Amino acid sequence: MTSAEDRRLIARWSHRFGFGPKPGQFRALVDSGIDRAFNSLIDTTPSLFDIQLINELLSIKDLGDQPRSNTPQIVPYANEKRRQIRALTLWWISVMCSTDNPLSERMTWFWHGHWATSFQKVDEPLLISMQNFTLRRNALGNFRQMCKEMVVDPALVYWLDAQSSTAKSPNENLARELMELFILGVDRYSEMDVKQAALALTGYRLKKSSGVVTYNAALHYSNPVTILGKTSPLDALSLVDLLVDQDNCLRFVSERLWYRFVSTSAPLPSDNSLKQSFNNRDISSLIKIGRAHV
């Protein structure tokens, strides 16, 4: 018979690693026993969908360039954008409610908040859809791979104005957020690191309506840059490698997941078990160690 403490743990895990149990699920988890319940709730099977199929189903597509505001085409264009983003939002809520992979969906939602982007500025449902599928594909995979895909994610590129950054006029927004919010954390880099990283991120162009990101070598700063004490020529992907290799990346991601899944006030374990489990930057390994703490 499952103890009251085990029932409490299963209930807690259900809400931490998912969105709470579906009808009848809590009883099934309790009946399965504490070990099987935990393994079921931390099932790292990715919540994958065919993006082309879903976009076709929801009629999310490239609408082309925005018509001028004083033309009759602007109203149906704006209405169609609103319809598309509403359809995508309702689809994702439906998936959250019905998924058989709650941890994967919860982690997709977690990374959606981590890589903060908003439709209010991006204003292209297709780009938001593309980002959602990038996040769910990498939600429980390798953090390095996620960062490499996200640094050239069209919604993030536009959100942080990276599409206009050139060697002669570098934009620091993506460089700063990449270090502060996405990979290293606050006060773990210098202002000179930001300026140099901004140079590494130059030369990327975006076709906004389609989400196609391209690289123009003529607009990229090709000379060596010095970031976190290391000097070499860098582009977006090699910059990600440099940042993800830092001990502060290991520390930052461990902190972020600890605060989301365990406690906003309790410190990380002093035995460094969380950080050690993330040595290879595998997100699922970091999640699986959570049983001892959640």
Stretches found by the model and what they are:
Residues 23-138:
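N-terminal accessory alpha/beta regions
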Residues 88-92, 124-291:
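Active-site substrate-binding loop specific to GH73 endo-beta-N-acetylglucosaminidase modules
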Residues 8-16, 59-65, 80-83, 169-173:
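Short, compositionally biased low-complexity segments
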Residues 2-52, 152-156, 164-165, 177-180, ...:
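Cell-wall polysaccharide-cleaving catalytic domain and substrate-binding groove, primarily
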Residues 1-9, 83, 98-103, 189, ...:
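Structural motif
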Residues 8, 12, 102-117, 139-152, ...:
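Hydrophobic/aromatic-rich, well-ordered segments within soluble, folded domains that form packed cores
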Residues 3-5, 69-78, 110-112, 143, ...:
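Generic detector of short, locally flexible boundary/turn motifs and exposed helical patches
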